[in-house]
């Protein structure tokens, strides 16, 4: 899973500061602290969503580049191993290639949606990312022996 860029504590701190600055702008006269908080929360949530979207896209693009390098390396290794091991390694290479293409498609979709990227698209991309990471880790430990 891709780690969140903004923690819940940081988010709450940002909301508190934004609410404070709202009250400060009106000279701490009038207004309602609850309304300040709710409006600040909406602003901060939007900013955090933008930050998280950019962070997710960056992580997925980095993962895609890593998967492409790993796939090239595994293809070279597969051609030089014994035929019995080659079949198993080739299945893993094919699986990694399939996952890489799914991730590439997800990244392309997220990039096209930009700020409008939905939670479903993000979850799907993260799921593919998790599977891809598992396969790369398993292959890395198997081929390093």
Q: Predicted regions span which residues?
A:
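Intrinsically disordered, low-complexity, basic-enriched segments
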Residues: 1-145
């Amino acid at each position: 899973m891709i780690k969140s860029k903004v923690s819940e504590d940081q988010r709450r701190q940002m909301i508190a500061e934004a609410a404070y600055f709202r009250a400060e702008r009106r000279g701490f006269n009038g207004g309602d602290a609850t309304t300040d908080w709710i409006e600040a929360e909406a602003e901060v949530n939007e900013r955090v969503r933008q930050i998280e979207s950019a962070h997710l896209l960056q992580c997925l693009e980095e993962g895609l580049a890593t998967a492409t390098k790993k796939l090239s390396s595994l293809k070279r290794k597969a051609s030089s191993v014994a035929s019995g091991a080659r079949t198993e390694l080739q299945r893993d290479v094919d699986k990694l290639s399939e996952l890489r293409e799914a991730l590439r498609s997800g990244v392309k979709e997220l990039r096209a949606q930009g700020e409008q990227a939905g939670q479903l698209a993000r979850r799907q991309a993260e799921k593919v990312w998790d599977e891809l990471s598992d396969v790369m880790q398993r292959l890395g430990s198997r081929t390093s022996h």
